[in-house]
Regions:
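Extended, low-polarity transmembrane helix blocks
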Residues: 1-34, 58, 73-140
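Perimembrane loop-to-helix junctions flanking transmembrane segments
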Residues: 38-53
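Membrane-interface loop-to-helix entry segments
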Residues: 55-62
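Core segments of transmembrane alpha-helices
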Residues: 63-68
Length: 140
């Protein structure tokens, strides 16, 4: 007889794929163990060259590893999503505007992040709640 899978099994798979993906791609920014194809356009090449020469990409890659690790850890997955969200948006914009070949990966990662975020919606609900009484100006 086949046992039923736990209810959160799809979330665990999504966390594993997204977390390992960002850990691997983040670590690759430091260790260069995976070949990275060069950008197709000259503007994309100079853009990435500038980001790399300033050390900006090292910070982004470290944040990718941190976010991926938090997602894999489980309990702090919402914090990992908060870290990775802006990175995913920037990767998507780069792919849309400069180099389309990475778009399928970022779409899959974005869908996984949205799925995980939806399953943790209770952690994100306060961001969307308006607390007008805390925002009033009490001047002289």
């Amino acid at each position: 007889m086949v046992e039923k899978l736990p209810k959160n099994y799809p979330v665990a798979i999504a966390k594993a794929i997204l977390g390992v993906g960002f850990l691997v791609f983040g670590a690759n920014g430091f260790l260069h163990f995976l070949p990275v194809p060069p950008p197709v356009s000259a503007s994309a090449q100079s853009f990435l060259g500038l980001l790399d020469s300033t050390g900006y990409m090292k910070v982004v890659k470290a944040l990718e590893m941190l976010g991926g690790g938090l997602i894999l850890g489980g309990r702090l997955a919402p914090l990992g999503l908060l870290i990775l969200g802006p990175i995913l948006v920037n990767i998507a914009l780069y792919d849309l505007l400069m180099d389309l070949k990475g778009l399928p990966v970022v779409l899959v990662f974005g869908a996984l992040a949205l799925f995980i975020g939806y399953r943790h919606k209770e952690h994100f609900a306060p961001f969307f709640k308006v607390h007008a009484e805390h925002c009033t100006f009490k001047g002289k």
